[in-house]
Amino acid sequence: MTSWLPQNLQKRLLLYTIKQVSLFSNVDVSNLDVSIGSQSHFGFTDIDLNVCEINLPNIEVLSGRISKLNLQLAVAGNVEISGEGMVFVLKPADGFFDDDSSEQWASSLTKSVMDMTKSILDTELSEYQSKIYKDTNEDIKPPTALDSMMDKVLRVALSKLTINLKNVELQLIISPELMLKISISEVKMISADEKRIADVIGVSAVFSKPEQSVPSYGSSSSDKEDDNTSDSEDPLSTSITYSKLEATSIYLSAMESLVLDSLDGETYQFLNIDKIEVQFQGITSINDLKVHDLKIKINALDIHLENVSSILSHIMSLLNHVQLSNSEDKIRTQELKSYKRFQHEQNIEEDKTLTFVLLNSLKFHLRDNLFIMLTEISLNSSVSPYTSVSISDIQLVLDSKEYINRSDSSEPFLSLNKNSSTSEQKLHLNRDIKVEVDYSLMKQLILFANDYMCLYNQIIERPSTYADPSADPKFLLSSQNVCFLLNLGDLIMEFHFSPFFSNIPHTTFKIPKLSIFSVQNNEKSHIGELTDFEFHSRKSGCFNISGANSKFCASNVNTKTKATLENLEVSILESDMNKIIQCLSGVLGSLPELLLSSGETTSSKNMEKRSVRMMQSSAFLHNRTALSMFCVQINCMKIKISNISGKAFGDLMITARKSLIYQDKYSDLSISFTEFTAQRQYRSEKTDIIFDINHDSNIANFVINRTKVGKIKAYLTGVGIFIHTKWSELFSGQKTENSINEQKKNAKTLVSIPIDIKLYDCALSLKPCRLSTGLAINIPRAQINITKNEITLSTKILDLLLIDDMNLIHETDLGHTTSTSNWYEKQGYSSLVKIDTLSVRFCPGGVASTRVNVHKIDSSICSDSFNALIQTIIDLKPVVTYPENVKYQLEPELVSVFEDLTDQYFTTARISENDLEIYPDTYSNSGESLVFEENYFSPKLESPSKNEVNMAVFEILSNVKISVDEIKLKLYDGYDWKHTRKEINSAVEQLEENFKDGLSCPDAKVFDSIYIPAPRDEDENIKSNINMKIHNEETKEGKMKLRPTKKYKILIQGNGIKVNIQSGNDELRTTSTLPLSDNTYDILNETSVQINNLEIVDNLPTSTWNKFLTRTKLKTTNTLQQSPMFSLRFTMIRPTPHLYATELIFSVHVKPISLHVDQDALEFLTLFFQFKDPRFELIDDYPDIPYIQRFEINSVKILLDYKPKKVDYVGLRSGKTKEFMNFFILDQAKINLKHVILYGIDGFSRLETILTDIWTPDITKTQLPGILGALTPFKPFAGLSYGARALVSVPTEQYQQSGRLGTSLQKGGMVFLRTTGGEFVKLAVRLTSGTQTILESTEKLLGGQGSNGRNIKIKLVEGDEIVDAFIDESILRSTTLFDNTANDNNHLDVILPQGDTQKVISLYADQPKDFYSGLHDAYSSFGRNLNITFDSMKQAKNDIKTANGAQEAVSTVAKAAPLALIRPLIGVTEALSKTLQGLNNQYDQEEIAHIEEKYKSSN
């Protein structure tokens, strides 16, 4: 065109031409500047692009505006394009997941180029255009001559293309709350031959949170309709007339203004690039728009990740959609595999799009002042099919401090080689590196990780698509030596990694060796070593790992990430370990809070799913399956802590096998150990501290769970813990003043994280300080809860087992037993105590409070095991003794009288006469007399006790309350320990050997309680006597039965036991802090014991009495009856606060008690508690006898029944007057032990002697008549005398009160009749019972059945077996241990068999409750005796018939005649006795309760 055309017509022609280009269809003629000629110039201002014609993949263009655009065209073919102020507003497309979205970009670009070419050639291409845009399924016709001409023109134009754009801006609306703004300062591109060179300057990306929400814009349907109908109108007339898109332009302008205004809100810098240099080849024709041989050079790239964390949630959904779209694209690219294979077979190489990239500096800003910088990053893919990437250097900088050090080398820091033909990638770390981490860096990294944890979780949770395993890329990683330094202030931890490698998909990551060192004061120590660490990860599928859950059942752990460690060995000194722990706690103390703030989830789904595995059979195995984020397996872990407590403790070796650590996606962490043991190694001695008990080694026995809320749960099964109480002395000396102060400071807080511990079949073994015994506490099931303010323990059953010598533990293969108690019993332990339902609650604070509640304690014990148990419990507390010089003040203090006086105090040498004032004499003018005040100098007398109480200092620090509902102590005869039985056997054999050799045989005494008399003749068998004493049965000669009896002999039962212990400060006070008074003392602790009810049950087979001790039944109210039967309060004080000497103060209160004392039971109890084994004697370095400062006991009323069995005549001849008591039987003797207060007593043995010396004379002087009245022969007469006395005393008292003589005489008579009548009946019962016994003994002597004829059916004390009664005169003798003297006091007893023992039942037992029952029992007993007579006569008749001669017949008649006469008499006496007993009990109901408590029952 020439310049003679009018300007208006040139604009109209240009407008018509440009509108043929789809992007510029909205151009207005008023915004055009046209100059057409050899150097044509086209100028555009304020262009609104037709964004409906722009189709980008997954992106919708909302608006496009160009402020200024210039186009210069030369006839020679040069094309220059310059623009300024380009703004595009975009958003994610609505059809984001459409499969053909990626093809829309190529179609839009091709259409725009075609429109531009058509406008330049000024030809009609409508027909050709229609052919271009036919469906892709139609065949494409070969190019025409016109097509070739167009392609040639385009090549010339593109070869001389120059572009210069300024102020380019892209605004991407990610969501209504978030926008991304990308700004480019300048874009320059020039063309030289086939090369294109472009420079992009000043690229920045900013995220913005608009102050107002940005609406979503899309192309309306009306716009599309207008666009579709535009071709039907006349193009030229349309261009000349007013543009119909003016309204749309106005709308877009308003929308753009709204978007720009929204950028005034809060902005976040994301990316900065100072300059990008791009060089490429391509875009030469309309049919070849490909770009190849692309080379990019970037000077500096800054990525600000610290600003992205706050808006990360908004863009994650967009990234997820992009990921899903890319995955679909990858699936579609699988269709080109056959084509790629064809190219490979034909050796046809494709032109590479990207051949070289150089990035001088890449800086990731993680957080404030923390960044990672990579320098000289280069990518080279010029040589096909290889691609190499290298990083020259890497830096990690925080606050201008660099944390990564590299070795010097000419090679790049990191290099990556990729082979596209084999999909193999090789990454090499070419330098030795050293990474240092301190608290500041670790804190910033954890905060950064917390910010991006959601991104990691979404990557893990992203659904994986199926891919061909053969198509997985191969990745090889190798490195040089890596050193990781953890700076903890005064300590540096070094981790040295050997060259590690990775081989994906086989091994994700592997470290052959990792060595750990500690550096203190420039001294380097080797701590531990890890070998064969492997890390595996899967994109699809999961690793299935066998584990265990909290119920110790098999569980499967499914995870995509797994780490395996073959061996972990740590060897460290205790001092170094303490230093490391101190540094870690100080430096990393706040890190757990940072970690807890990450990974918050809201899902409440069950973490475990049930999986079913089908076996070959029809059985199904159900295992729990846990989904985890990662899993770590440690096959073997060994930790050795040396020189504990300064070599005094030795070394501690901790071993764990088959350890499993995993965390689920809800941040619950689980740790399990299959074998976890700890062993102490001291010189050549090895002691197991933590060990397996009766546990299968294939099942985990230690599981720890840490929930996302921070609660720790521990589960233990089959775990035993051994503690030697002497170890506390080793560690107590290691406590420094700072550690003690720290403990006091944190005394109110136990733990910061709640801990729950559950125990299943576990045990705690304790060894005392000085003894060789061992105490084991079996815990079948228990739960321990530890919170910030308290510790609670609850269990249903506890079993206490004891062994007398731990050196005698059987080292045999125990295998798997039925219970933990059996496991210990096989080792030689003996079960002694069982505790039912125990609960403990401990609360720290100013006053530490402990509450212990026990439902029932049941103990079955022998004398030797009881002695061992008591001594063991005493010895469990560490021994604390002091020499005399620190307990007492052995030397008086020297007091200087004149210390506070000056030397010149009493001299007048320095007094001047001028200093003396002379006062004149004064006299009283009045004649008043002097008045003297008496008692002016007399001090006020105060109670010493009050002064002492006021001067006592008791600062309570802890309070322990123990409550026991019921306790049973069953005392067995026999001996538990093999050593005891062996000593008795040796003593007996020595006596027998000496007797056979004719040597003198003095009596032997074993264990201070077992007396073995020497044999008096050859017929006496010591072993048989011992067996008779213990088991009440004779055995074969030469065999002794010393094991415990099957039934207990004494039962001590207590109910409602309460113990309250208050402890104070036991530290010495210095003399400077003491008050002036000498009466000041410190109270160390105060203990009170209350027992509501205490009973001792007599179960000896030779005793007829039931309860040895019980509460006296008083005719009082129930409230008084419920008061404690026994109360004890004792206080330990320190009389001199600056000395270690202590004293005791006792106060005892006992309610009235009843004693039914059988001499055999008394002797058994005495010998039981006197047993002393020299092995269990506690010897202190400084023996201390307890000094009792004050002892007080109230007046005790005793109702005593006493039945002697034998008399010690030897002791009687030696002056023991107590033996006179064994001549008499006492029945309800009333004894009152008077109130006693004692001061200054040395030891408890001395206390016993003093009390005996006080009470015995008082009883003999003031209470002898009452005791004599309780003697059995005089008891009836004493009752009759009391009745006669009541006949006078009662009327007199009643007459004095009421004044009525008749009523008084009536009451007196009633008392007389009731008393005398009852005593007459009792006397008759005694006479009839005595007569029955005499008749039965006579019958027995004459060959009859004797007491066997009663035929009483009884129940055993601890069984349901029914046996028949029998009598054996030979065992009516004394049953003392080695004395066969006849016993005449058993004439009213009958012996009944009871398993391995024989039970004796008195004739006074099982009395009828009323007169009717007495008649019924009398009738039954009389009939039974007549039947016995009839049977004996019938038997005699049969014997006479079968007799061989008259002499034998007469002998049979002589034997049967007395029996026939005596047995009916026995029946009469027994019937009369039962009748009288029923009559007596009819009028005295209290006698029934007394009989039931006193006598054993046959029922």
Curated annotation (Swiss-Prot):
How is this protein situated with respect to the membrane?
Peripheral membrane protein
Question: Which Gene Ontology MF annotations are present?
Answer: phosphatidylinositol-3-phosphate binding; protein-membrane adaptor activity
Chain segments carrying region Disordered: 211-237
Q: One GO term of the cellular component aspect?
A: phagophore
Q: Name one GO biological process term.
A: piecemeal microautophagy of the nucleus
Question: Phenotype on deletion?
Answer: Still forms preautophagosomal structures (PAS) in proximity to the vacuolar membrane.
Note whether Ion transport occurs among the keywords.
no
Which portions of the chain have biased composition (kind: Acidic residues)? 224-234
Q: Which UniProt keywords apply?
A: Autophagy, Endoplasmic reticulum, Lipid transport, Membrane, Protein transport, Transport
* Disulfide topology: none
Comp. bias (Polar residues): 211-221
Q: Which domain of life is it from?
A: Eukaryota
Reactions listed under catalytic activity: a 1,2-diacyl-sn-glycero-3-phosphocholine(in) = a 1,2-diacyl-sn-glycero-3-phosphocholine(out); a 1,2-diacyl-sn-glycero-3-phospho-L-serine(in) = a 1,2-diacyl-sn-glycero-3-phospho-L-serine(out); a 1,2-diacyl-sn-glycero-3-phosphoethanolamine(in) = a 1,2-diacyl-sn-glycero-3-phosphoethanolamine(out)
Q: What is its main location?
A: membrane
Places the protein is found = Preautophagosomal structure membrane; Endoplasmic reticulum membrane
The record's listing under InterPro entries reads: ATG2
Give the similarity note.
Answer: Belongs to the ATG2 family.
Report the protein's function.
Lipid transfer protein required for autophagosome completion and peroxisome degradation. Tethers the edge of the isolation membrane (IM) to the endoplasmic reticulum (ER) and mediates direct lipid transfer from ER to IM for IM expansion. ATG2 binds to the ER exit site (ERES), which is the membrane source for autophagosome formation, using basic residues in its N-terminal region (NR) and to the expanding edge of the IM through its C-terminal region. The latter binding is assisted by an ATG18-PtdIns3P interaction.
Could you tell me which PANTHER family the record lists for this protein? AUTOPHAGY-RELATED 2, ISOFORM A
**Any extra remark in the record?**
Kluyveromyces marxianus proteins are shorter in length and have a more ordered secondary structure than their S.cerevisiae counterparts, which might contribute to the superior thermotolerance and solubility. K.marxianus could be therefore useful as a new model organism for further elucidation of the molecular details of autophagy.
Write down what this protein is called: Autophagy-related protein 2
Higher taxonomy: Eukaryota, Fungi, Dikarya, Ascomycota, Saccharomycotina
